């Protein structure tokens, strides 16, 4: 036995309390010659083998019955490639020694990871299949700077933390190890002796695949190939493009009728994708697909930020789904949750025994609304972990946009907190300066690294400049959900039409701030849960009036400036709230033609008409693209406006939000001529009363509303009509 290895070191190594296994294990130069040491629990016989010849070079002596072997090779002076012939339970196995390989992470990578400027940390950290010195295996690395010891445990070593302790790179706090023979498909975790001497078993923060709940192991999985976005996909995200988003929860869009089980990614590719295309939507937005332990979180409490959930299939199945959407001309938006994470023991919480990813003070690090933990954006490695994740989904899966969840909870330290429950920033303010900088940096990097990709913010306050450049004080998002518009218009629509005249401003107020941001008009999943009722059920009146109100509202929404978003089920007026544990109520579309079919046809026509006419989308964020024609007729609850494209082509939109038809309704227009009714939400095609204007109307040289020419229309009850000028 070498004089350098004393009994205390062996005991610590076997007990899993030794932080530097490479200083003991592997091949070492000693005064007696080359010495090979190995920790092989349960082994009875160990020989050193030279692979070139297959010859036994020397036998290792068992110095501790718990599995510590050591032997000197006196005839050898220079290091050489070797293998170990190990006998376990009477059977000999030829293995490569993990402790004969040098450091894995390049110095530049380690420096960038420590600086928080490694744009793609997932290419270095985590588990990656590799070949080293002709040996195939997997290199593992994990950031845990305060751990006393870290081991890889998995199916390849009986989940025994003694067998594969890792090397600590002190300059970066990263532990690393190459394990020969570990391969794709095998499960693994990291076993940590944490800063307090406690044992923790953690999933890999960078795992590309993970087990489905209730299991929590990570899975070795190759890094997906890069996806290059085509020109059409890039154009589809632009400010002047028609954007109509179908928001989907993959687990409840449709289920198998025989067992209520989810559709797989591939089944969704075959069913959801063609349906969304047929309906005329331009984008699919997916509620979070990151692996998550609790179905009831809808994915908004992820534990596997880099792993698509296994509920619906494999990582490659998810890529198949994305490819199918792109082939159908649909861009894909992913709901992304960088604002918080769950406190499950196997995940990021107190990862190495310290508050590594989260703040230590609960006034900063604990989200009391959701019982989750808040990322410490001021720690470079943490913000780098998140920025890298954004690029990962876009570059490796072809995700076209990220919709960032709960931005307000990120940028305000006092979000949902009472006095005394939060800590001011360094200037005494309520803004989370680190989170703001993180969002700006993420958006900047997306813009620089992924051409055509965009981000969207769900931001519920009046924070100024969410979609403005960081250099002007903004956050740098491309789009922001207009939650104010959504609340105001839904509050208006749920009123009995008799009372709407007193709340006329709820429909007009949105234009006062419309050009402060680049808005998306969202009727999202949040509006059909928690006792809020379905959108249909919020409408007043009897069944006929409920459907008429809904159709009028959709006609108004699709014509109003801003991109469109509709949660699944709303396109056919589902009557009950959304239930994440069940399929949508597709049975409402079974049997004979009914009101639900009418709404579905309307949404389809709205989408296709909206996409066809540039006036409805080209200048959403330019004042020239919108003009009120009638804004003050609150007594009759009538509103009329014009949408306009760059060439000056106009579409007139007129809404009557009472059940009383308005005959001979005259209003001034900008462009005289022949106007065709291109959409009428009261059409019998949508199960309306079929009141209208016979298809075409001609303007009169009669002054009205301060304009020289005017139209005289019949405005159907509880309806919106669109008119297009088609000639003099």
Swiss-Prot record:
Pfam families cross-referenced by the UniProt entry: Alpha-amylase, Alpha-amylase_C, CBM_48, GlgB_N
Keywords: Carbohydrate metabolism, Glycogen biosynthesis, Glycogen metabolism, Glycosyltransferase, Transferase
Enzyme class (EC, first level): transferase
Annotated active site: 405 (nucleophile), 458 (proton donor)
Enzyme Commission code: 2.4.1.18
Pathway: Glycan biosynthesis; glycogen biosynthesis
Record bears the keyword Magnesium: no
GO biological process: glycogen biosynthetic process
SUPFAM superfamilies membership: (Trans)glycosidases (SSF51445), E set domains (SSF81296), Glycosyl hydrolase domain (SSF51011)
InterPro entries reported for this sequence: A-amylase/branching_C, Branching_enzy, GlgB, GlgB_N, GlgB_N_E_set_prok, Glyco_hydro_13_cat_dom, Glyco_hydro_13_N, Glyco_hydro_b
Catalytic activity field: Transfers a segment of a (1->4)-alpha-D-glucan chain to a primary hydroxy group in a similar glucan chain
GO CC, alphabetical: cytoplasm; cytosol
Signal peptide positions on this chain: none
Iron-sulfur recorded as keyword: no
Function comment: Catalyzes the formation of the alpha-1,6-glucosidic linkages in glycogen by scission of a 1,4-alpha-linked oligosaccharide from growing alpha-1,4-glucan chains and the subsequent attachment of the oligosaccharide to the alpha-1,6 position.
Family annotation (HAMAP family): GlgB
Record-stated family: Belongs to the glycosyl hydrolase 13 family. GlgB subfamily.
Complex formation: Monomer.
Name of the protein this chain belongs to: 1,4-alpha-glucan branching enzyme GlgB
Taxonomic lineage: Bacteria, Pseudomonadati, Pseudomonadota, Gammaproteobacteria, Enterobacterales
Gene: glgB
